[in-house]
């Protein structure tokens, strides 16, 4: 209530547009800066593989000459002998004879922490050195996912980033509503007016860039929520693949506990590898062989066709850990689109699922998030500066505007 000359007047009820506008800038002053940090770290991780490959270019190459590569079990045994108690969990091999092997170790059974990965010579098993920048990108990933707050995925950091991801969807919805023109002119809607001075220029840049990037941010937000909220992931799984997919166990090694491996034999791995190389492996480019152990109860071979780099085209075959007999295979070409999206949710999140051009677009969109925080803060400050003189001139100190 406002009191003026003894008369009580009710405060005007703000319009929906005013409420949404205040919600937009209030979230911008809070969640906006967390999203800016998530955008920067996400953009950096968009090209993690390329950056890591450049930093390790000397360790990723070996001299093949006329040497014959070791069988997987022999290669793993030689690496284990140099690893100081660490056990090889997976080998990534290439059809390029001059490419080194990428070696991932099994998690520590007590701490569940995975030791640093290394590169190794596939011909003699010599360890060429650890993967440079792996630890740095692990820190960037933790910063992106839960802000390095103690507790990791079970702490408050995941709650905060999940809430900020929801805020991004609110930004998109309220921004489009507030910007929806009374006069529909595509030139005004899609082209920024940078020649206008002051607040109009910043508003035009903020609004037009947001309009262009709305589809990208929507994909980023919706896929990001699958890591933040299990219920949302279950709903997305049901929508994309049907209810039967929800009952399947986790496919990724290290996610949950697998059943113990009964009577696993080293020669079974070599049999499975030989069968794969004689069959579908003839057209394989990059192959990841996951050995049976505490994390995986079968021999799993995942591969990309020769000349293909997108993980969304990855195929998979499974073999019995005791005999090396073929169990099942799954090919990307035969997988329905919904399941492809679920199995490559990270690639969708990064834009690589749609091709290299979209990967670059998603990276640039992530880099633009700090720009939205900066322009939004600039608009807020300029608006507050313009509002204070108006309040001083208004009778009784009342603001002439509801915003």
Positions of predicted regions on the chain:
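Conserved histidines in hydrophobic membrane contexts and catalytic metal-binding motifs
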Residues: 2-403
